Amino acid sequence: RLTIDKNDVHLSYLPLPHVFERCTQVSLLNAGARIGFYQGDTLKILEDLQALRPTIFPSVPRLLNRIHDRLRAQVAEAGGLKAKLFAQAYAAKQEGLKSGTFRHPLWDRLVFSKIKERVGLNRIKVMITGSAPIADHVLDFLRIVFCCPVLEGYGMTE
């Protein structure tokens, strides 16, 4: 069960007329959560994440795919022991996902906490995505690396 309170933070970067963003803001404000707005440059969203360290991150597949691709590339570039450790940690957590477990005491502390800190999602409780399809392997990657549920929303705004 997800509880939202005054300690929660949301990075708002989606257009305010967007129904998804509007519903998110109303819900969070109703619960007393805080909302930080991005700098206005979508290329600097990762900087904004690092500054605000949100607990709730509604996003769109385009950005989540970008995060996935960048992290995968960094792991491949690191190579050697780091890549092997990541692969082992990832495989262990992938097994846990089958039973609905997002966390692993050893691998989260040893591997994934560093990634979460670097991205600015070390306090994340939930990610929510919508507006377009997103691949299952990307959703699983995000659940494994960021140790949280990633929910998909569907709707029609026309």
Regions found by a protein language model. Give the residues of each.
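Active-site phosphate/pyrophosphate- and oxyanion-stabilizing loops and adjacent acidic/basic residues
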Residues: L43, S113, D140
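Conserved AMP-binding/adenylation subdomain of ANL enzymes
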Residues: R1-S12, L16-R109, V145
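Membrane-proximal helix-turn-helix segments that form the acceptor-binding/catalytic region
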Residues: F112-I124
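Flexible, glycine/threonine-enriched loop-and-boundary segments that flank and lead into catalytic domains
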Residues: R109, R118, D136-H137, F141-I144
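Conserved A3 ("GATE") glycine/threonine-rich loop of ANL adenylate-forming enzymes
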Residues: R62, K125, G130-V138, C148-E158
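Residue-level recognition of the N-termini of beta-strands and the immediately preceding loop/turn
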Residues: D8-V9, I124-V126
